[in-house]
UniProtKB/Swiss-Prot annotation:
Pathway the protein acts in: Amine and polyamine biosynthesis; putrescine biosynthesis via agmatine pathway; putrescine from agmatine: step 1/1
Protein name, entry field: Agmatinase
HAMAP family, per database record: SpeB
Family that this chain belongs to: Belongs to the arginase family. Agmatinase subfamily.
Species of provenance: Photorhabdus laumondii subsp. laumondii (strain DSM 15139 / CIP 105565 / TT01) (Photorhabdus luminescens subsp. laumondii)
Cofactor: Mn(2+)
Residues of the signal peptide: none
């Protein structure tokens, strides 16, 4: 038996085809697979207000993930992800390019089908608007959820078009998808409303307070509700993630973001996404690498609960 250095996966092939995130198997019928988590790319950026290009984010995250796949286990975890969690990558959602409504409908339908088959989802954007149809699907399955939201922007603005990557978390509470009083926004450092019920841990707090103190507040706020976890890559300082459409200085380091993510392990996380990676503005793939690493940490969180 030949063992590839990429993810300790058996590989006797003489030819190579496109591969999934972290070289997980591609499965275009994930609903009938034995997977526990399904990775879905959403190459959509029509709701962007700044620089476009995040539609190429899913491909960039997958491509750079081969730099992570050679490790049999990700530091500092003490187990192999592949041994604890069944994951497939089902590729990208297919929709009519240029039709935001069609994307929203197709993504929600796909998510509802995945969840109905007993699986859970990790999605790659694409701009942050994709989280809204995902929340609609998850709320149908899990009921009203708490939101744990890493971002430079609160995305609670009431203005904007029907499809806008700055209004999802205005619409989501109004549609009854999430409970803002049990939701936390982390790393915010732009103008935002203060009377909408969300707990906002702005960038100054996140950078100045201890990780343990922050995690205690997050856990107390969320309680035992089902949690949707969304990570906009512009939560990170542009020094660590320049490749995004709306960068804002003064953000989180990758070290602090990873420590906060690892501390979310006790939460009942039912869905996750990583959004707003725009490789056209990246340098040496560091933004894509940050996105891929954050996605991998999210999967390790889920795998750790099975040990």
């Amino acid at each position: 038996m030949t063992i590839s250095t990429l993810g300790n996966q058996q590989d006797d092939s003489l030819v190579s085809n496109a591969f999934g995130f972290l070289r997980f198997p591609l499965n275009f019928q994930p609903y009938s697979s034995d997977a526990e988590w399904v990775i879905t790319g959403v190459p959509f950026d029509m709701a962007t207000s700044g620089r476009a290009g995040s539609r190429h984010g899913p491909a960039a995250i997958r491509q750079v993930s081969t730099n992570l796949a050679w490790e049999s286990r990700r530091w500092p975890w003490d187990f192999k992800l592949h041994n604890c969690l069944k994951v497939v990558d089902c590729g990208d959602v297919v929709f009519n390019f240029g039709d935001a409504q069609d994307m929203s409908d197709k993504l929600q339908a796909h998510a509802e089908k995945v969840l109905a088959s007993g699986k859970r989802m990790l999605s790659f954007g694409g701009d942050h608007f994709i989280t809204l149809p995902l929340l609609r699907a998850h709320a149908k399955h899990f009921g009203k959820m708490a939101l744990v939201h890493f971002d430079a922007h609160a995305d609670t603005y009431p203005n904007g078009s029907q499809f806008d990557h700055g209004t999802m978390f205005y619409h989501a509470p109004n549609e009854g998808l999430i409970d803002p009083h049990h939701s936390v926004q982390i790393g915010i450092r732009t103008e935002h409303g203060r009377d909408n019920g969300f707990t906002v841990l702005d960038a100054d707090q996140v950078n100045d307070r201890s990780v343990d103190d922050l995690l205690a507040q997050i856990k107390e706020t969320v309680g035992d509700m089902p949690v949707y976890l969304t990570f906009d890559i512009d939560c990170l300082d542009p020094a660590f993630a320049p490749g995004t459409g709306t960068p804002v200085i003064g953000g989180l380091t990758t070290d602090r973001a990873l420590k906060l993510l690892r501390g979310l392990q006790p939460l009942n996380i039912v869905g996750m996404d990583v959004v707003e990676v725009a490789p056209a503005y990246d340098q040496s793939e560091i933004t894509a690498l940050a996105g891929a690493t954050i996605a991998l940490e999210m999967l390790y969180l889920q795998a750790s609960k099975k040990r």
